[in-house]
Amino acid sequence: MASKRGAPSSAPASVATSPTPAPPGTLHATLTELPKGQVLHRVHQDKYRANQFNPGVRGNARFSPIQDDHGQPIPTLYAGTTMDCAVMETVFHDVPHTAGFKTFDKGKLAGQVHSTVAVARPLRVVDLASVPLRKLGITRKQLLDTEKDQYPATRKWAEALHRQYSDAQGLSWVSRQDDSARAFMFFGDRIPDGVLKPQGASRSLVEDGNAYDAVLDLAERIGVLIVPAR
């Protein structure tokens, strides 16, 4: 029987609004090359070196911690193509999308540093931009724009990509927090020593004047007022 004109549609909700699905048995990924000489930015705790991988034992990020086929943790390292991206993906990650100025405790910047590393040789990474995601069979909203409750599911995709593409050395996507830049996550078991070369000393986000000025500039652009540590 034909539906009545104007009747509400009974079609299922769009796949774009569904939770992150499990990765299929066979993935169709697109690999791209990160060129030699590319400089990447990182924000991390000052107790770690600029090119030091997270051992992957604990944490709760979109693509880490993850394990290989033998249940062993895969070391990971996150980076971005700009300092803005690195700051937005770390210390400003949870700033709410509310109008007007928001306050941010300066104490949250303590112990955080900005580092840069240069890629010493080309690296092959899985491209998670919108076009290759269509071939992969998942939407950006399901994989990259989810909230934290979906992180266990998004990590399954990182594990599956690592398992099925033995030449993949990491993942690359348009940053959710700063869509003018690219974010990266590298697989530590596939990045030889010396490939990520630190460029100069790491800079404290609080104690280094130039680094703090850059943080203040970004804070103003996202409507954040940095207040003294409580």
What annotation goes with each model-predicted range?
Residues 2-65, 97-230:
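Active-site and NAD+-binding cores of ADP-ribose-processing enzymes
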Residues 65-98:
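Extended catalytic/binding region for NAD+/ADP-ribose chemistry, centered on the ART fold
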